[in-house]
Amino acid sequence: MEAYEQVQKGPLKLKGVAELGVTKRKKKKKDKDKAKMLEAMGTSKKSEEEKRRCLDKRTPAQAAFEKMQEKRQMERILKKASKTHKQRVEDFNRHLDTLTEHYDIPKVSWTK
């Protein structure tokens, strides 16, 4: 019986896991936080522009490449936004009509 006297009596403890308990919720600060956020937004816009100028270490080719990518992206968005859903469906159906019968899907039945 002496061998069992040193046994841990209680729940097992996991390493690296904080003990779970009741934690109090933090109170929200409304007015002060809003004023600070508005002030920070004004200064952050100015600082962002300055950071862009200072931290822009791209080569001219990289800058031109990104500018063209943005331009093409805008063109794609405008092209997709110009058609309505109904027009897209009609175009798709016209495309399916032009395909050969090789692409037709045969009737599939799971009962046979």
Curated annotation (Swiss-Prot):
Residues 45-56 have a biased composition (Basic and acidic residues). One of its GO terms (biological process) is apoptotic process. InterPro entries: FAM32A. It is found in: Nucleus. Widely expressed, with highest level in pancreas and lowest in muscle. The keyword Hydrolase does not apply. Keywords: Apoptosis, Cell cycle, Nucleus. Its main location: nucleus. GO terms for cellular component: nucleolus; nucleoplasm. Residues 23-56 are annotated as: Disordered. May induce G2 arrest and apoptosis. May also increase cell sensitivity to apoptotic stimuli. In cell lines, may play a role in the inhibition of anchor-independent cell growth. Belongs to the FAM32 family. This is Protein FAM32A. It comes from Mus musculus (Mouse). The gene is Fam32a.
